[in-house]
């Protein structure tokens, strides 16, 4: 009997690059808020995750706006992962703006301006708008022409007659000639499902009606069902924007059509500051929208990693910004112990001034034990689609304890290439030993430098 050929279809979707925290999918908590030992890509750090879970609940209930949080712990203990877990738990509707302390230093823009931009990027505004729309399948589309007013043989379109059909009924519409241009731009034809906004005259082609799904067409069409309800309906449209989007839109109005404006648009614009006056005007409009019930403020999260990189000016600015009416939840992270505040001789815990530390609640992250390190390395191997045996994981756990977790995880990719060169799919102990002899960790390199100090230029 002839063998039936069955082929698997490979997905054409783009594969995302595997980053350091790709495996983090949330905080891994039960509905009661109790952390699960191994869940959502997280291993251990039970107290820190439980504390972060309470923060997420407070953010969702809008009880934590203007408050700040500090994630403190040694390097490689999951501070950034914890912040990312918080953002995953909050979902895509709550703005999450990550930045690094060193980002504030720019030759063009003041430090405080960079901080303010990120503050406003972390505050969302949900605008609800009721729009009148005509929606349905196009059954007739005929432009009506008249003699051109300028004379000659040319003709101009006076109006467009269009018939839209839904499940409930049909409507004949007489549209303005400007809408005809929008119909041509969207390539609307009979059998397409479209919707037209009554106020602006904007036309959106949703797709082809599924009644035509049996047609053979070279171009891949998106087939959509016939719209339900009446042709003329009111739709509530919700838009999510950030305050920084509003600032940027109003700070750079579109230029005219003259040659100077066009040249100015083509040239690379220099990054300029948005004035306080403009921000205050936008705040007034936002407050009016909130009072009218048109918009709703969504305080998001601003995550500042390596907070010890900020100086006294930034910290004094943060003190004031945290107490303003429009302030997001700010999460700081640092791996410093007692050190000088940048630009001063004043020692302070975590490199943060005492007056700002008073305003923070601090979450500690603990160093991972060997069994937790082995579990993390196993999760990373799974994410990177690598096969690692048990003996190899134990060795990587020992390397992680001796050097750092990051170094142990970084050895996985080169070890997989060594395994493939040796004709194996799975990584074994010999591959890890070979890679370890090739690549030094920070402690080994420092020890070597100390031993061969006289051979280096100091």
UniProtKB/Swiss-Prot annotation:
Xref: Pfam families: TIP49, TIP49_C
Localization per Swiss-Prot or TrEMBL: Nucleus
GO cellular component labels: nucleolus; nucleus; Swr1 complex
Binding site for ATP: 73-80
UniProt-recorded Gene Ontology molecular function terms: ATP binding; ATP hydrolysis activity; ATP-dependent activity, acting on DNA; helicase activity
Keywords: ATP-binding, Developmental protein, Differentiation, Flowering, Helicase, Hydrolase, Nucleotide-binding, Nucleus
Major subcellular location class: nucleus
E.C. number(s) listed in UniProt: 3.6.4.12
A biological-process GO annotation: regulation of defense response to fungus
Keyword set includes ATP-binding: yes
Disrupted-gene phenotype: Gametophyte lethality.
Reactions catalysed: ATP + H2O = ADP + phosphate + H(+)
Domain of life: Eukaryota
Function of the protein: Proposed core component of the chromatin remodeling INO80 complex which is involved in transcriptional regulation, DNA replication and probably DNA repair. Component of the NuA4 histone acetyltransferase complex which is involved in transcriptional activation of select genes principally by acetylation of nucleosomal histones H4 and H2A. Has single-stranded DNA-stimulated ATPase and ATP-dependent DNA helicase (3' to 5') activity suggesting a role in nuclear processes such as recombination and transcription.
Family to which the UniProt record says this protein belongs: Belongs to the RuvB family.
Record's subunit section: Interacts with FRI, and with FLX and FES1, two component of the transcription activator complex FRI-C. Interacts with the disease resistance genes RPM1 and RPP5.
Protein's name according to its UniProt entry: RuvB-like protein 1
Species: Arabidopsis thaliana
């Amino acid at each position: 009997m002839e063998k039936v050929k069955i082929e698997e279809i490979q997905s054409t979707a783009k594969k995302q690059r595997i980053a350091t925290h790709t495996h983090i999918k949330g905080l891994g908590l039960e509905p009661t808020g109790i952390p699960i030992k191994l869940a959502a890509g997280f291993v251990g750090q039970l107290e820190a995750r439980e504390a972060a879970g309470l923060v997420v609940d407070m953010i969702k209930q809008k009880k934590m706006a203007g408050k700040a949080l500090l994630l403190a712990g040694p390097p490689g203990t999951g501070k950034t992962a914890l912040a990312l877990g918080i953002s995953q738990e909050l979902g895509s509707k709550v703005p999450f703006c990550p930045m690094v302390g060193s980002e504030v230093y720019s030759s063009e823009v003041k430090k405080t301006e960079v901080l303010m931009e990120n503050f406003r990027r972390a505050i969302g505004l949900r605008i609800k708008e009721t729009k009148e729309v005509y929606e349905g399948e196009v059954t007739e589309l005929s432009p009506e022409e008249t003699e051109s007013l300028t004379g000659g043989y040319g003709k101009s379109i006076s109006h467009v007659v269009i018939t839209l059909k839904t499940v409930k009924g049909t409507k004949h519409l007489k549209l303005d000639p400007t809408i005809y241009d929008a119909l041509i731009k969207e390539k609307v034809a009979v059998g397409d499902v479209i919707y037209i906004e009554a106020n602006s005259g904007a036309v959106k082609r949703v797709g082809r009606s599924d009644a035509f799904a049996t047609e053979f067409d070279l171009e891949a069409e998106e087939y959509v069902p016939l719209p339900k309800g009446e042709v003329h309906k009111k739709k509530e449209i919700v838009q999510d924007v950030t305050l920084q989007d509003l600032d940027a839109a109003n700070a750079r109005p579109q230029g005219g059509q003259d040659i100077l404006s066009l040249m100015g648009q083509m040239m690379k614009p220099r990054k300029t500051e948005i004035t306080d006056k403009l921000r205050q005007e936008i705040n007034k409009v936002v407050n009016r929208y909130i009072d009218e019930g048109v918009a709703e403020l969504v305080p998001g999260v601003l995550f500042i990693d390596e907070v010890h990189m900020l100086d006294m000016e930034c910290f004094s600015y943060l003190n004031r910004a945290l107490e303003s009416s429009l302030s997001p939840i700010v999460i700081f992270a640092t791996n410093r112990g007692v050190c000088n505040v940048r630009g001063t001789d004043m020692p302070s815990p975590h490199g943060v001034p005492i007056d700002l530390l008073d305003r923070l609640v601090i979450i500690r992250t603990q160093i991972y034990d060997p069994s937790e390190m082995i579990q993390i390395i196993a999760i990373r191997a799974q994410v990177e689609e690598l096969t690692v045996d048990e003996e190899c994981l134990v060795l990587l756990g020992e390397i992680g304890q001796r050097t750092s977790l990051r170094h142990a995880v970084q050895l996985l990719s080169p070890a997989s290439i060594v395994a493939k060169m040796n004709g194996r799919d799975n990584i074994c102990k010999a591959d890890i030993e070979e890679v370890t002899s090739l690549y030094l960790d920070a402690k080994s390199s420092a020890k070597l430098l100390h031993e061969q100090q006289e051979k280096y230029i100091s």
